[in-house]
Structure formats: structure tokens, C-alpha cells
Amino acid sequence: MQLEQSPLVAQHRALDANLVEFGGWEMPIAYPSGTVAEHLACRHGAAMFDVSHLGSVRIEGEGAFDRLQATFTNDLNKVAPGRAQYTHLLDAADASVLDDIIIWWHPRADGEPDVFDVMPNASNTDDVVAAIGGVEATRTRAVIAVQGPEAKTQLAAVFPAAAAVGRFRVAICEWNGTNCTVGGTGYTGEPGVEIAVPVDAAPALWEAIVAAGITPAGLGARDTLRLESGLPLHGQELGAGITSLQADLAWVVAWNKPAFTGRDAALAEREAGVARRLFGITVEGRRPARTGCAISINGKVVGEVTSGNFSPVLGHAIALGFLPPETSEGQAVSIDVRGKELIGRIVRPPFV
């Protein structure tokens, strides 16, 4: 299968990135500095990520608001033009989370038409287009995420308008004569922005941000950062057979909205109660539990790990997993990793 390539692939190769397949795209998993160094750069300074593999669906004009409102779980009436919102697309039959999505609602003047950029996970873009219509715009732009406690300070030297965009705000910002859409969003648990830049201008913007001293980081660090922050990954904590309630994301569902796809099934589960719920686990030692490892309480297998890895900040392993809903914080668990028992304790994410 021919992999999709980021508009920034030449820049990654010039930096000697380790490129791997991810969601049908050839993307950097790490640079020579390594995942741990990249992770810590984001936690303590600033890092930049190419996330151009994320989908982008443009939906605009009359009826756009109503279509999104009738499809996704969250309530767009809670926000306004110039804001971003996290939401879910559910399966109508069982309320499984088909995708978790960020919506960027472009700023507009009174009387101007609404413009939304709906950003699904890479492998789910076609399904989202089928659900809401619109025009796929993934290949018209690159997306550069600049994240970390020093991200905005360092980015301001290169792109001050983008650095000024607030958390969950959306703005159109000009860089060297090119309009970029900038959202105060991310997937690391740190402050920062994501910049959607037209393909032709993307390499120059990437190189300018690198030259400002911000550390390039791969998808390996992005994954360990989101895990430390307790953020779900579609295909692991979300997906077929996993609902918003089970993933401990009931806040993403606007229960008072009169209609959205999967509403009846979601309400039925809320009424009946969930059979399992997502928990965090701190694990003794550095060895990580991996997806699918069995979790036991008092010698009985009661669940399994969905994500696990070493936490560079904490210095030991952490995990997420589904367990019975009555499981309590502080409870001791054991995890079977290829016949070796790891000892852990239940916590409520985030881990850091």
C-alpha cells in the first residue's frame, strides 16, 4: 500500500527522523534525540509535532451548524465562532465512539456564513465525511502543533499572532503573507497551539520554528505525553464497543440536546449503568504493561490494559485500562506481562 506523506516529509528526513507507518501515513516516530528527550522538552520547555495526518473536513454555510449539532454529542451552543470544541461521533446502535473529534469554528463577523474545520483521526476521515458531508481538506494543509510551557514564548519570536491564540480559541493568522488557521488545542496536556498552514508555506514555517529553538518531536513522544495526561487514543481507549460513559467522558455528551447520532443508545446505557470504566494505574518499576495485558484484583482477572508505557516524568510505568465500575482509587492490582506479574495501584488520571 502506498503511504500518504506529510508535506513536511523532506524536513523530517533532513533531521534524520525515524519514519514509520501510522494510520496510512509515513510519519516521524522520533528524531535522533529520542522519545524521552522529546517528551521532556515538551513538559519542561517547548516541542513541535507534525500532525498533518489528522483529518480535516471543511463544512460551511447554511445548515452547517445544524448538521454538526444533530450528529455529534457535544453542544455547539456552549461555544461560538472563534472557539474550538472536543466532541464524539457515536454509533447509532450501541453508542460506541466511532471517532473523537476537535471542531474549529472559524471566527466571523455578524452576517457572515459559518465555517467549521472538523478534525477526525486519520483513519476515520471517510466515516466522518459520510456522517456530516463537507469537503475533505486534509491534503491542502500541514498541521504543526507547538506545545509546552514555553511554547508560546518561543513561538512568538517567529509567529507572534499564532502565539497569542488562547486555549480552545480559533483565529486566522497571517505568516509571511499566508493565512493560517490556528487553534489553541493539542494532545499533550501542555499549553500551546496547532497551526494549519497551506501546503506551499508549510516547509518554511516548520524550518522557522525549528530555527527558533523549539524541539522537533515525533509521534512516540506525543503518545507518552497524552498517556501521562490521561488522554484517550482512538483504537485503544475509544472505538468499537467502547462508549463515552465507559471511557469516563460523560462530559462530552450534551444529554439535554434533543438529538444526536447514538443518543437513544447512550441514554439507555446511562440508565442501566456501565459494565466497565476506564481507570489509571501507576505501576511499580520501569517495565510497561502493554495493550491487552490482563489486570487482576485479589487474584481474579477483572479487566485489561488499553495503553501502557514508561512515564519519563514520573520515572516508572503507567497504564490505562478498563475495570469494573466499582473499582476504587488506591486499590492494588496486578498486571500479567508475558507471565511476569507487575504490581500497580488504581489512580484517577491525569498522572502528571
Task: Outline where the language-model segments fall.
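Short coil/turn segments at secondary-structure boundaries
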Residues: 55, 59, 93, 116-123
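Conserved, structured C-terminal
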Residues: 1-23, 27-30, 105-352
